[in-house]
Amino acid sequence: MMMASKDATSSVDGASGAGQLVPEVNASDPLAMDPVAGSSTAVATAGQVNPIDPWIINNFVQAPQGEFTISPNNTPGDVLFDLSLGPHLNPFLLHLSQMYNGWVGNMRVRIMLAGNAFTAGKIIVSCIPPGFGSHNLTIAQATLFPHVIADVRTLDPIEVPLEDVRNVLFHNNDRNQQTMRLVCMLYTPLRTGGGTGDSFVVAGRVMTCPSPDFNFLFLVPPTVEQKTRPFTLPNLPLSSLSNSRAPLPISSMGISPDNVQSVQFQNGRCTLDGRLVGTTPVSLSHVAKIRGTSNGTVINLTELDGTPFHPFEGPAPIGFPDLGGCDWHINMTQFGHSSQTQYDVDTTPDTFVPHLGSIQANGIGSGNYVGVLSWISPPSHPSGSQVDLWKIPNYGSSITEATHLAPSVYPPGFGEVLVFFMSKMPGPGAYNLPCLLPQEYISHLASEQAPTVGEAALLHYVDPDTGRNLGEFKAYPDGFLTCVPNGASSGPQQLPINGVFVFVSWVSRFYQLKPVGTASSARGRLGLRR
């Protein structure tokens, strides 16, 4: 079978014009694999086998997290997708699996590449049996298993049988059993035919359908249906959102490989399923606030609602400022008094131990106080130090586990950088305060608590006035965003802050993002119009 358009013109010598650009390979024959017994071996023990609608067996549909891209940033050996055999590979089977306790059988997989004649490169698709780890797989090891090597210019779908190799009679839905895995890796890097210019990004999709021997076992008694909340983000422009480390409006979005790419902020930390981490509060009114009782020397911290703070249960009370590398200037109000007084807090001495529930404020008297961070200045100790808002203060213990600090985050994807939301922090210098998520996103996620059903959420940053997609972003379950900077520009990239982040779909963590500024237009009316 010619991997070229059938209506392409022929040259003088009779060769197909498209065939001169597209490699001639034969993908009509399926990958040679010995057949594996399907549901027949489970009939004797299951007592019942429930056949599937023929339409589902005869039609390929896109697998959840079945989108992938190949870009010039990828290198040979990079994993493009890693999928395991199971009902979750097909949306219809995933829906039906909720009605049964077990499943058994093989599946058929088609890989479709949206390549072109201007970019060349090869991928290798391997079927990895259970028991072999796919995380540290090399290209050489991948060729040991049933595999197919295809050019990204291939026009016809690549069909691969995914056999149910197992050491049990059938699989239980409530057990995490190892199954056959389909792993796709970059075999040779992308390159252009002319030798100059950047290669195009090649997109691909994974389509699946069950084999005729795929069946479900053991019907589950019906229960009251519970509606699952879909994952969403606030439909608000970035210019109307607030910083989650200080009560300040967002002034810009920081996209630059020059920024710090591993941070451990304790405020502004929330997982995509709504779990608060560190000292993050739900409400903006609790951000960068302190409450406690002073004896004239130290302030014994309490929670903002007045309940006692229990040392060793967290790094500090909820909402406690997490700005390190600076001195704090806090406007304090004593309960029972109408006046407000500003006190200075040095975050470097040994008396600063919020993990143990106490800090020291210069010149404060006895009483019950509540305060909010007003502005910052360079740290008093050591003398001559500069403000560094990428750091967090020393909470009073060098043992991370003892203080229950929120873990550090870093960009896990190929060529990705962390996305920071910046605000102008008051002080004697031009200080940009970064945070990982706007506070309104944290309130929304904590309220919705929508389950994460993928390894990353694909987001589009859309201009609500024009509908143009300004860039692709990924939101990871730990609660941070990443993107791929445009290599054509140097230094930090600036995007307008009137855009809206829109959830598109769940994707694999291997999904390769398009560089910022190269995405296509978005569809539909999204965001608020101003």
Curated annotation (Swiss-Prot):
Protruding domain as annotated region, ranges: 226-530
UniProt-annotated stretches for the region P2 sub-domain: 279-405
SUPFAM superfamilies from the UniProt entry: Positive stranded ssRNA viruses
Name this polypeptide is given: Capsid protein VP1
Renumbered residue ranges of the record's region P1 sub-domain 2: 406-530
Site entry (Cleavage), positions: 227-228
Keywords, alphabetical: Capsid protein, Host cytoplasm, T=3 icosahedral capsid protein, Virion
Claim: Lipoprotein is one of the keywords in the record: no
Residue numbers spanned by region Shell domain: 1-225
Region (P1 sub-domain 1): 226-278
Region (Disordered): 1-20
Gene Ontology MF, one: identical protein binding
UniProt GO cellular component terms: host cell cytoplasm; T=3 icosahedral viral capsid
Region (Plays a role in binding to host histo-blood group structures antigens and in the formation of P-particles): 523-530
Organism of this sequence: Norovirus (strain Human/NoV/United States/Norwalk/1968/GI)
Sequence similarity: Belongs to the caliciviridae capsid protein family.
